[in-house]
Amino acid sequence: MEATKVHVVIGVDPENRMYLLDLWRGQTSSDVWIEAWCDLVCKWKPAFWAEEYGQIISGVGPYLKRRAIERRAYTCREQFPSRGDKAVRAQSMRGRMATLGLYVRQGAPWFADLRAELLSFPAGKHDDQVDALGLVGQLLNKIRAGENPKPPTVVRSDGYVPSSEDTRNWSWKTL
């Protein structure tokens, strides 16, 4: 029986609020979850990806790397050892969620299962989604708040621009 694999994608807005943008979960063979991982990386383009060291490197690491290159699924993958108990490993994310929250789209098809697992942890039957969020917690020191989008540049139809916006570095000789 294959182990359940979970991928989560987190985003952070300019106010440092964390959003669970996407989640994939499946009890599948390695090739299936690797394709799901590539799909998420291509869709969301995350800056970092946390994964368990032993499980990935010793098992499917070369295949994952090859598929990522073939699919152009580029991100900075960071491996963390899976030591200690799961409740301890989830503490950094638990603290982050307690202070600044974790925003989740309630209409998401995976929301009910995620909520049930979070509320029953550590006594619940399943903890794979908690593990995935705990891995995100390992990256908290690298996560920065997002930036507000810059307003679009307005181009005047007559071709004139204010001198403060002119980027040609005029000198007194060209006036």
Predicted regions: what is each one?
Residues 1-79, 104-175:
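RNase H-like, metal-dependent nuclease domains and their acidic two-metal-ion catalytic environment used
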Residues 70-96:
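Conserved beta-strand -> loop -> alpha-helix junction used to position metal-binding or nucleic-acid-contacting
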Residues 100-101:
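Short glycine-centered helix-capping/turn motifs at secondary-structure transition points
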